């Protein structure tokens, strides 16, 4: 290697003196040593490089002899010799060798793997890249581009996003490109090439950005269902999925609507009072009424399967999940039920502690949370049904709440919304803006959506609301005004809000298909 002697003979005294000239204290930069330091235009120093040296007279002859001996040794001998040789070198020589070795130690393993028949490993490695990195990988060289193309890595990236993100999953269903994912054969039987998915990805991102912008700016399309109640008007409760909307009405009926055609598919009758609350899953619809009963219906046939008689006044709210149901009533009590089946529902425990009507309940595996006209939120242990703590802060009765993870969001007749940490009972934020009682509230990871007796629906920034540094005036993103009466209930997802009102209508606010963009 140029720049140092490679003789196998012990160094002469003069050679040792020359090599040890920079030994400790090693001054890299002196007036007499063999290094020079250049200055860059900005005043910083460049790397230190050796000056050109004249090679000794015997170097060329001895170099070939060194190489000849070196090649005759075993690999272990070669390594030991090089280590010994390096240990005798000066600091700047180490730097010179390091610069020489760096490119030799770099390996394009993505290109090397297919050459050994290991394409699948190269594809698997690159499949962990995000979109920006995958774009860069395509530009490295032709072989990297071939690996990304043959491995259908854009398809795999989109599939990964659909599996892990509900917004992507919803877009796949609504836009129709979900049929080209997860090894499903498309209708024409032909699998699109990688370029199809490469072009699809930015279109998905554009859709997502449009949805976010529409939510913030209030751009939406609107569909309206007129419930046409024959007696008293008002839609007290609802729940929806992609196919249907189930609504509970003031005229004592449950109406099921086709979400696409907006036509009424079925009317369930049996309650003798207004239907105030409901929930359904893939098997049953469970409803609570001002007639003090809870009724269970077959979700597919509409047949009434069970009637639960326990509360002595109106059943104001209910929730069920994983074989358990919780109901609450104007009679100030909370009932906890075990659900073995639709026809086998037994009362487990009655929770008493509120001093006024219990308007709403929610629960998970850890806590049952209830809110009342007595201005308090109470927390109960789900397993033992024992009381845990009370959340105090609202100035008037509480009409609605939702609980998930550590967060409770509540709405009150004091016209405010409060965010609570359920573990310590602290109020994290107070949201002000509604002019009358806040009747319904829902939240997800990004937003809070509230409806009130002022007829308005407000969209709030949840992330900002949880940041104590965020100014109060920036938290309400948009106010939606279309209902002509009190807003009783709402539900929302990434794409839409569905709301019901005292004006006897159900509104579908679609933030994906903004007519202004058509």
From Swiss-Prot:
The keyword Repeat applies. Residues 1-12 have a biased composition (Polar residues). It comes from the Eukaryota. Residues 119-157 form the F-box domain. The keyword Protein biosynthesis does not apply. GO terms for biological process: Wnt signaling pathway. WD repeats lie at residues 230-258, 270-298, 310-338, 353-381, 393-421, 433-461, 482-510. Residues 1-24 are annotated as: Disordered. Residues 14-24 have a biased composition (Basic and acidic residues). GO terms for molecular function: beta-catenin binding; phosphoprotein binding; protein dimerization activity. InterPro entries: Beta-TrCP_D (IPR021977), F-box-like_dom_sf (IPR036047), F-box_dom (IPR001810), G-protein_beta_WD-40_rep (IPR020472), WD-F-box_domain-protein (IPR050995), WD40/YVTN_repeat-like_dom_sf (IPR015943), WD40_repeat_CS (IPR019775), WD40_repeat_dom_sf (IPR036322). SMART domains: Beta-TrCP_D (SM01028), FBOX (SM00256), WD40 (SM00320). Keywords: Repeat, Ubl conjugation pathway, WD repeat, Wnt signaling pathway. CDD domains: F-box_FBXW1A, WD40. PANTHER family: F-BOX_WD REPEAT-CONTAINING PROTEIN 1A, WD40 REPEAT PF20. Part of a SCF (SKP1-cullin-F-box) ubiquitin-protein ligase complex. Interacts with fbxo5. Substrate recognition component of a SCF (SKP1-CUL1-F-box protein) E3 ubiquitin-protein ligase complex which mediates the ubiquitination and subsequent proteasomal degradation of target proteins. Probably recognizes and binds to phosphorylated target proteins. May participate in Wnt signaling. This is Beta-TrCP. It comes from Xenopus laevis (African clawed frog). The gene is fbxw1.
């Amino acid at each position: 290697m140029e720049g140092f002697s490679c003789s196998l003979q012990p160094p002469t005294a003069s050679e040792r003196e020359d090599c040890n000239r920079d030994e400790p204290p090693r001054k890299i930069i002196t007036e007499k040593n063999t290094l020079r330091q250049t200055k860059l235009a900005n005043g910083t120093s460049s790397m230190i490089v050796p000056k050109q040296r004249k090679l000794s007279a015997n170097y060329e002859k001895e170099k070939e002899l060194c190489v000849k001996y070196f090649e005759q040794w075993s690999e272990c001998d070669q390594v030991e010799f090089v280590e010994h040789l390096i240990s005798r070198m000066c600091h700047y020589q180490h730097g010179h060798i390091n610069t020489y070795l760096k490119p030799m130690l770099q390996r394009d393993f993505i290109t090397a793997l297919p050459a050994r028949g290991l394409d699948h490993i190269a594809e698997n490695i690159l499949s962990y890249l995000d979109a920006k990195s995958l774009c860069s990988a395509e530009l490295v060289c032709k072989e990297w581009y071939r690996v990304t193309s043959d491995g259908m890595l854009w398809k795999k990236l989109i599939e990964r996003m659909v599996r892990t993100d509900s917004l992507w999953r919803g877009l796949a269903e609504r836009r129709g490109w979900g049929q080209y994912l997860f090894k499903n054969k498309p209708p024409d039987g032909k699998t699109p090439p990688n370029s199809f998915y490469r072009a699809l990805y930015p279109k998905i991102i554009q859709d997502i950005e449009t949805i976010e912008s529409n939510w913030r700016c209030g751009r939406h399309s609107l569909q309206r269902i007129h419930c046409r109640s024959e007696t008293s008007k008002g839609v007290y409760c609802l729940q929806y999925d992609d196919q249907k909307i189930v609504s509970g009405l003031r005229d004592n009926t449950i109406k099921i609507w086709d979400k696409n055609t907006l036509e009424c598919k079925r009317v369930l009758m049996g309650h003798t009072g207004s239907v105030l609350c409901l929930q359904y899953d893939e098997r049953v619809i469970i409803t609570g009424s001002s007639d003090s009963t809870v009724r269970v219906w077959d979700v597919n046939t509409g047949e009434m399967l069970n009637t639960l008689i326990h509360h002595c006044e109106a059943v104001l709210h209910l929730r069920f999940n994983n074989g358990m149901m919780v109901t609450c009533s104007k009679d100030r009590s909370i009932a906890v039920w075990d659900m073995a089946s639709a026809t086998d529902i037994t009362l487990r425990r009655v929770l008493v502690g509120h001093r006024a009507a219990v308007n709403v309940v929610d629960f998970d595996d850890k806590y049952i949370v209830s809110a009342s006209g007595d201005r308090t939120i109470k927390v109960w242990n789900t397993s033992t049904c024992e009381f845990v703590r009370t959340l105090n802060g609202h100035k008037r009765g509480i009409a609605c709440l939702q609980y998930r993870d550590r967060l409770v969001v509540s709405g009150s007749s004091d016209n405010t919304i409060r965010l609570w940490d359920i573990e310590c009972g602290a109020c994290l934020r107070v949201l002000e803006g509604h002019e009358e009682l806040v009747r319904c509230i829902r939240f997800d990871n990004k937003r809070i959506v509230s409806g009130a007796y002022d007829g308005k629906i407000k969209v709030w920034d949840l992330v900002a609301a949880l940041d104590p540094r965020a100014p109060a005036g920036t938290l309400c993103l948009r106010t939606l005004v279309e209902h002509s009466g009190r807003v009783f209930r709402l539900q929302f997802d990434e794409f839409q809000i569905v709301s019901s009102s005292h004006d006897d209508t159900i509104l579908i606010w679609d933030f994906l298909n903004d007519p202004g963009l058509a």
